[in-house]
């Protein structure tokens, strides 16, 4: 039993404080491809399919891609403050965020 308790206490792994810090859209746009980000803001508009315009508290906008399964149980509208976690996806002309998870900020 003691070994079970010890293994539960040891469960987990390395968590960088930098991966959970919220940054601005402006800062996210400066990061390298595949950089992990956490953003807070609102969905400004639905572009098409799984692409949305996301706006932060500074009114900066970035396109985010949220697959249906990544929404989980979250239902949101233009007034819902969200926290999104994902990766920067840069190509030659555009930068977007591939979203891994969405949660409502309470």
Predicted regions and their residues:
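Bacterial N-terminal signal peptides
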Residues: 1-7
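OB-fold and OB-like single-stranded nucleic-acid-recognition modules
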Residues: 7-106
């Amino acid at each position: 039993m003691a070994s079970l308790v010890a293994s539960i206490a040891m469960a987990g792994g390395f968590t960088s404080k930098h991966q959970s810090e919220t940054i601005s859209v402006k800062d996210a746009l400066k990061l390298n491809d595949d950089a992990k980000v956490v953003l807070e803001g609102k969905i400004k508009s639905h572009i098409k399919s799984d692409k949305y315009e996301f706006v932060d508290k500074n009114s900066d906008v970035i396109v985010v891609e949220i697959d249906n399964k990544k929404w989980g149980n979250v239902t949101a509208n233009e007034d819902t403050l969200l926290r999104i976690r994902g990766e920067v996806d840069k190509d030659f002309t555009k930068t977007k965020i591939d979203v891994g998870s969405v949660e409502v900020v309470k």
